[in-house]
Amino acid sequence: MEHYISLLIRSIFIENLALSFFLGMCTFLAVSKKVKTAMGLGIAVIVVQTVAVPANNLIYNYVLKDGALVSGLDLSFLSFITFIGVIAALVQILEMALDKYFPALYNALGIFLPLITVNCAIFGGVSFMVQRDYNFVESVVYGVGSGAGWMLAIVAMAGIREKMKYSDVPEGLRGLGITFITAGLMALGFMSFSGISL
C-alpha cells in the first residue's frame, strides 16, 4: 500500500506532467484564464487519464507486447496508434456525457475538450506507463495521480491569472508574456519536490 501512495504523491508533485515535463502546455496556457473552466478541464483530464492509462496497459500487455498473443509475435510497433485510438474513443465518450449532463461546462471548454485527444499530457501519461513497466494497479494509481497533478497545475495557474487581472503588469508582458513567466516560476517551485525520494 505504501508503494501506491508513494507513486500517487510522486505523480502529483514530483513528476508533475505540466510543470516537470511541460506536457499539455497548449491547453494549460489557453484554458487557464478562469478557475471554473480550468477546474472543469482538470476533472476531464483526470477522468481520461484514469481510464486511458489502465486501458492502454491492458491492451499493451495482452495484445501488443512481444509474445502477448502468440510466441514470437511483437505488435509493439502499433502501440502509438493504438494508444491514440483508445484516448480518442474515451474523449468522445466524455464529450458526449458532458454535452448531455453538463452543457455549461461543455460550452465553456469549447474546442479544447476535443483537443484532449491530442493533448500530449494524456499521451505522455500512457507512454510513461509503458516505459516504466507499471502493472495494472500501478497504472490506475499513476493515471489518477498524473491527472490530479495536471489539474493542480492548471487550477493554480488559473487562480494566479485571475489575481493578475488586478495587477499592474508592464505593457510588454501583458497576456502570454507574464503567463509564461508565471508558469516558469511555478515549475521552479515544483522542482523543489524533486529532491524528495519516496
Swiss-Prot record:
Pfam families xrefs: Rnf-Nqr
E.C. number: 7.2.1.1
Transport found in the keyword field: yes
Membrane topology: Multi-pass membrane protein
UniProt feature coiled coil, ranges: none
GO annotation, biological process: respiratory electron transport chain; sodium ion transport
Presence of keyword Cell inner membrane: yes
Catalytic activity: a ubiquinone + n Na(+)(in) + NADH + H(+) = a ubiquinol + n Na(+)(out) + NAD(+)
One function term, GO molecular function aspect: oxidoreductase activity, acting on NAD(P)H, quinone or similar compound as acceptor
InterPro entries, sorted: NqrDE/RnfAE, NqrDE/RnfAE_oxidrdctase, NqrE
Keywords tagged on the record: Cell inner membrane, Cell membrane, Ion transport, Membrane, NAD, Sodium, Sodium transport, Translocase, Transmembrane, Transmembrane helix, Transport, Ubiquinone
Compartments it resides in: Cell inner membrane
GO cellular component, one term: plasma membrane
Record field: transmembrane: 11-31, 39-59, 77-97, 110-130, 140-160, 176-196
Function according to Swiss-Prot or TrEMBL: NQR complex catalyzes the reduction of ubiquinone-1 to ubiquinol by two successive reactions, coupled with the transport of Na(+) ions from the cytoplasm to the periplasm. NqrA to NqrE are probably involved in the second step, the conversion of ubisemiquinone to ubiquinol.
HAMAP family linked: NqrE
Family indicated by similarity: Belongs to the NqrDE/RnfAE family.
Protein name per the record: Na(+)-translocating NADH-quinone reductase subunit E
Source species of the chain: Aeromonas hydrophila subsp. hydrophila (strain ATCC 7966 / DSM 30187 / BCRC 13018 / CCUG 14551 / JCM 1027 / KCTC 2358 / NCIMB 9240 / NCTC 8049)
Gene: nqrE
